Regions:
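Alpha-helical oligomerization segments
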Residues: 123-159
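Intrinsically disordered, low-complexity N-terminal regions enriched in serine/proline/glycine
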Residues: 10-11, 15, 106-108, 124, ...
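N-terminal BTB/POZ boundary and linker segment
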Residues: 1-63, 112-113
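Weak global preference for isoleucine
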Residues: 4-5, 14, 22, 69, ...
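Canonical BTB/POZ domain core
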Residues: 48-137
């Protein structure tokens, strides 16, 4: 079991090669291909690589390594550590905001930015952002958070 506690030093090397890529094929192509099957794989016990438990939540998530390591240096490190332990089928993590994780995880699988955007509100936006930052998610996820901030929070403050 791999347990990671949020701290100041949770940043991981982004140049870690998570999977063996075919030379000349960008990682974004692999992610696009995975996301085409994302709805089928999201939280699917039958096809999952591991059970993911988030401290503070009672519901487990059934996750697939490839979806997560392509998008998060945090998960790259988690799966690297888990592969070196005797039991890599259960992963336990601690996040800044457990209650906003499920929609974020679904977004990582499907890439459905509108659905994820719609789960944000004034009360949870900052918590969503904390998870995005903690997991080291890339420009795409950050842009969705930024769009929410601009469209919903700044707009309402100006009126």
């Amino acid at each position: 079991m791999a347990t990671i506690i949020p701290s100041e030093d949770h940043y991981y090397a982004i140049n870690y090669t998570p999977v063996d890529f075919i030379e000349g094929v960008p990682a974004t192509y692999f992610l696009f291909s995975l996301r085409e099957q994302g709805e089928l794989h999201f939280n699917n016990f039958d096809t999952a690589d591991a059970e993911l438990r988030v401290e503070g939540l009672t519901t487990p998530f059934w996750v697939h390594k490839d979806y997560l390591i392509l998008q998060s240096p945090f998960f790259r490190e988690i799966f690297r550590e888990a592969s070196q332990s005797s039991d890599d089928s259960l992963i336990v993590i601690n996040l800044p905001s457990p209650e906003t994780f499920a929609p974020l995880l679904e977004y990582l699988y499907t890439g459905n930015d509108e659905k994820w955007y719609d789960t944000m509100d004034r009360n949870n936006y900052y918590d969503v952002w904390l998870n995005v930052d903690f997991l080291g998610l890339g420009k795409e996820a950050r842009a969705i958070c930024f769009a929410y901030y601009q469209n919903e929070i700044l707009e309402s403050e100006e009126t």
